[in-house]
Curated annotation (Swiss-Prot):
It comes from the Eukaryota. The lineage of its organism: Eukaryota, Viridiplantae, Streptophyta, Embryophyta, Tracheophyta. It is an enzyme of class 1 (oxidoreductase). Gene3D superfamilies: Medium-chain alcohol dehydrogenases, catalytic domain, NAD(P)-binding Rossmann-like Domain. GO terms for cellular component: cytosol. Homodimer. Its cofactor is Zn(2+). It comes from Fragaria ananassa (Strawberry). This is Alcohol dehydrogenase. NAD(+) binds at residues 50, 203-208, 227, 232, 273, 296-298, 323, 373. Zn(2+) 1 binds at C48, T50, H70, C178. An alcohol binds at T50, H70. Zn(2+) 2 binds at C100, C103, C106, C114.
Amino acid sequence: MSSTEGKVICCRAAVAWEAGKPLVIEEVEVAPPQANVVRVKILYTSLCHTDVYFWEAKGQNPLFPRIYGHEAGGIVESVGEGVTDLKAGDHVLPVFTGECKECDHCKSEESNMCDLLRINTDRGVMLNDGKSRFSIKGKPIYHFVGTSTFSVYTVTHVGCLAKINPQSPLDKVCILSCGISTGLGATLNVRKPKKGSTVAVFGLGAVGLAAAEGARMAGASRIIGVDLNSNRFEEAKKFGITEFVNPKDHKKPVQEVIAELTNGGVDRSIECTGNIQAMIPAFECVHDGWGVAVLVGVPHKDAVFTTHPMNFLNERTLKGTFFGNYKPRTDIPSVVEKYMNKELEVDKFITHQLPFSQINKAFDYMLKGEGIRCIITMEE
């Protein structure tokens, strides 16, 4: 039993007091875990674009003060009543969505959209009692997607924790708890390109590069990267991108450009921007008869997807995916093992490292479009 079990822990956390304002390192109180909840010591966290999006208050009813962060790795400090498959000392990755293992979605081999623990960006409290476990001098600080990893200690539902190989380096595999797995799984689990196939990836941010990495692992012969920023092509080559298309360089629609490059269209495509102007060509550029397009990017709430019905009747398939169709507790440990077995290259996604005290610099990198992933070390 740890010396802190059952007690309130005081630790540092990066608190967002207002939308778009720099985070402030504060001393916060973290309450002990209740039933089916685990308290985790976060060792490394990363910044995902989703954190920035909601910090800017673009995607929800503004909820502040709040502790963001959802891409991280840590060690279990203590567990609440009813937690049987985790114990103090276990290495875990917190995940923004969960797996209760009891609902119809969790019991289905075809879904990872847990009824109980599916992502909820508006909820800033725990499920048990509708209250926060973070506070400063008695004033509650809100949670974010059930993880809040910008705190040295956090509490999360047991269903949102993937128990992983204790030999795996947390400062590397922490990035597998969100964006990288989303792109990787969209390719390997949903799009499933055959060896020697042609693939197009729309959007070469972290998720798109992970999708390209998945296509490389699957043995695709041509991986065409599509992005409005030509400066991304050189970096993208490290992830298997063999050709690059910038829609701004062509007078005709990009789906026509790709069709001409590939004798009628690619076998598989994946859209990772959330922009309708990319989603439509990502679907229309796949080959008739067998082409499959997968949508990963989250569109604007008022966006409308339009395409001619003949695109479907000509046997093109359009699919959507959530978190790469991975079940957090069941599947993410095996993704970590792909890294440990040298099947998956993770290190090349990590372009910056910072101490926790400089977390705002990570936001600057993201806002300027510099790098892919920045690892933040919680202990200095």
